[in-house]
Amino acid sequence: MSTLSTKEPLAAIVGPTATGKSTIALKVAARLGAEIISVDSAQVYRGMDIGTAKLLPEERVGPDGRPIPHHLIDIVDPDEPFSVADYQKLARQTITAIIRRGHLPLLVGGTGLYYQAVVDPYRFTPEGGDPRVRQELEELAAKFGDAYLHEQLKRVDPEAAKRIHPHDRRRLVRALEVFKTTGQPISAALAWRRQQESPYHLAAVALSMPRPLLYRRIEARVDAMIAAGLIEEVSRLLARYDYRLPALQALGYKEIGAYLRKEIELEEAIAILKRNTRRLAKRQLTWFRRDRRLHWWEVDPDKIEEISAAIADFISRTIDINVE
């Protein structure tokens, strides 16, 4: 592969859950000689397979049966700390390695923060943070609840408070930690990032789908996960790990975990999981709609071949790829 740009080429297929990103990405990767880099904050964890819709190794193949390399899947255990800064570092190293092999790196997934940490010049400061400040904030959250941290963040960084969910403890702690250790709001770093140019020659696609169809697919996906053994998967994880770990608060694992602890009935857990997945899809759409560099494709499940070919052609023309 060669490109006319002096920047490293990078392609991406992002969008809400259940829009068919994995299926389309395999076809696009096969056409372009690409290697896929997962952009999913839950697929990094080993043992979390069904609930994250992780493709099995034998499913990571193109239409001709040839393997499509996948990266940043199954890289840490659920009890290992892993941050967006860790992801950024590994993803950028992987991008460079793929290009050196003469292939195109293709980001695929729906975790908006991970995606933007790679394609934009995100700065993570202070490096490593301050464990004492972090511990203090964790203790405040345990004593007064996540909503208390969110109120504190509103006072010092209202822009960040708008972006961070009131119950996303990890990100609330991080935002307050940055303010307490630097005196600067974390939103200032985001504003700086928005003013800078991407370090990559980017061809980025986002997938969408009519909402009624998307919601039907979400319902069917959750039912399929239950049938495939999600309850057993969560049970195995809870036998080894503390359910309060950030990894096990991921979508699917939190709801089924509550059922296994007998806090709710299975029927209620499934209904909550479907509702939370719909809410996730809405948040993902909102996040990606803010990025004007994304070129949107509405997915018709009956026209996957045509859509995949069109996306591959768009990427090829945008980056001026010559596949060798």
Swiss-Prot record:
In this chain's numbering, which residues are marked as the site (Interaction with substrate tRNA)? 111, 134
Q: What is its EC number?
A: 2.5.1.75
For this UniProt record, the keywords arranged alphabetically read as follows: ATP-binding, Magnesium, Nucleotide-binding, Transferase, tRNA processing
Please provide the Gene Ontology terms (biological process) for this protein. tRNA modification
Q: Where does ATP bind?
A: 15-22
Query: What are the boundaries of the region Interaction with substrate tRNA?
Result: 40-43
Necessary cofactors: Mg(2+)
- Quote the InterPro entries the UniProt record gives: Dimethylallyltransferase (IPR039657), IPT (IPR018022), P-loop_NTPase (IPR027417)
Provide a Gene Ontology MF annotation, just one: ATP binding
Q: Does the keyword Nucleotide-binding apply?
A: yes
**Disulphides:** none
Binding residue positions for substrate = 17-22
Reaction equations catalysed: adenosine(37) in tRNA + dimethylallyl diphosphate = N(6)-dimethylallyladenosine(37) in tRNA + diphosphate
Listed under subunit, the entry gives: Monomer.
Family statement: Belongs to the IPP transferase family.
Q: What does this protein do?
A: Catalyzes the transfer of a dimethylallyl group onto the adenine at position 37 in tRNAs that read codons beginning with uridine, leading to the formation of N6-(dimethylallyl)adenosine (i(6)A).
Q: What is this protein called?
A: tRNA dimethylallyltransferase
- Native organism is Moorella thermoacetica (strain ATCC 39073 / JCM 9320)
